Each structure stands twice: as structure tokens, then as C-alpha cells.
A protein has these predicted regions:
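Hydrophobic small-molecule pocket/channel-lining residues, especially in calycin-type beta-barrels
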Residues: 13-173
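N-terminal amphipathic/basic-hydrophobic helices that include classical n-h-c signal peptides
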Residues: 1-15
């Protein structure tokens, strides 16, 4: 058994698969694979802005889905801001599903499109624990161009309509 290498978040993972080893259903998501890092900015209601650093890993694990892990922290003081883990799954040509768990007490299921290195997803379900942040909807856009990846997240909460929440620019490690 081969030794696993740590990824950007410190967990051990298999060496990156080559395009010929990928499950054929993942061809449209292959641009995501790898470890990414960079910075972003965000906006919390009622208008407080913040800057953050972010590390993201998209990993092929042998089945027709991509394992996803994200973590971010404040550029001001290094304190953790957010984590999320889950999977991206192809659901047919040009269609992708996202299943995520967030430590703020929510799970997210989203469906969307993938085309020419752009993924657009909208939540179809957001489930909350009794003490969760009152998130009601999420919309994501991920765009990959070579070794650059950009993220945008729009979020709605109880009493707050869907609006831009965070955006980041990442480079492949």
C-alpha cells in the first residue's frame, strides 16, 4: 500500500490521479482536482466586511465523485472562519450535484451545471440543527482557468434575501 501525502488541510490523501485514471463521468470536473490556496473577502449582514485566507482540496478517490474540503481563516488575526466538507457528483452531461456539511449546523444539497470550467450551483435543500445559523438558501459559482480558481457564494438567511456573501481567488498549489 502506498503512503498517503498530506493535502492543503493536513489530511493524508492518495497521489493525484492522471486524466487517464479518472472515472469517465468526471471529465467535466477534472479541472477542479488538486490543492488550491488564496485569499478572499466577505460581507456579513448588516454590512461588516472581512478578509480571509482559504485552502481548498478537490480529490479524486476512485469513484465517480470528487471529495471536497475547504477551510478559511481571518487575515487579521488568524482565527478560523469556516470549514466545509463534502462531495461533488456528476449527475449527467453538464449536470453536477453538491452535498456538503458545515460546522455551523447545516447540511447543503445543491444542483447545477458545469460547462467550460464553470460550475453554477443552487441549493435544493438546506437542513439545520436546532442551534444552526438560520441559512435558508445558497448559490455558488466556481470558475477554473488553468491554475486559477475563483469562488463566489451567495447566501440567504431568515430575514435576509439571497445576496453575495464571499468571494475568493485561489491558485493551484
Amino acid at each position: 500500500m502506498e503512503a498517503r501525502q498530506p493535502n492543503a488541510t493536513g489530511s493524508a490523501r492518495r497521489p493525484m490521479a492522471t486524466p487517464s485514471e479518472l472515472h469517465p463521468d468526471l471529465a467535466e470536473l477534472a479541472f477542479l482536482l488538486g490543492d488550491w490556496s488564496g485569499t478572499g473577502e466577505g460581507l456579513w449582514p448588516p454590512g461588516e466586511t472581512f478578509d480571509y485566507a482559504e485552502e481548498v482540496t478537490f480529490e479524486y478517490v476512485g469513484d465517480p465523485f470528487v471529495l471536497y474540503s475547504e477551510r478559511s481563516w481571518s487575515l487579521d488575526d488568524g482565527s478560523p472562519i469556516h470549514f466545509e466538507n463534502g462531495f461533488q457528483r456528476p449527475a449527467g452531461p453538464g449536470v453536477v450535484e453538491l452535498v456538503l456539511a458545515h460546522p455551523i449546523g447545516i447540511t447543503e444539497v445543491a444542483v447545477g451545471t458545469v460547462r467550460d470550467g464553470v460550475i453554477e450551483l443552487s441549493s435544493t435543500a438546506v437542513s439545520l440543527t436546532p442551534t444552526a445559523s438560520p441559512v435558508t438558501a445558497l448559490r455558488r459559482r466556481i470558475e477554473g482557468r488553468g491554475d486559477e480558481l475563483s469562488f463566489e457564494l451567495h447566501m440567504a438567511m431568515e430575514g435576509v434575501e439571497l445576496r453575495w456573501h464571499v468571494g475568493s481567488k485561489l491558485t493551484r498549489a
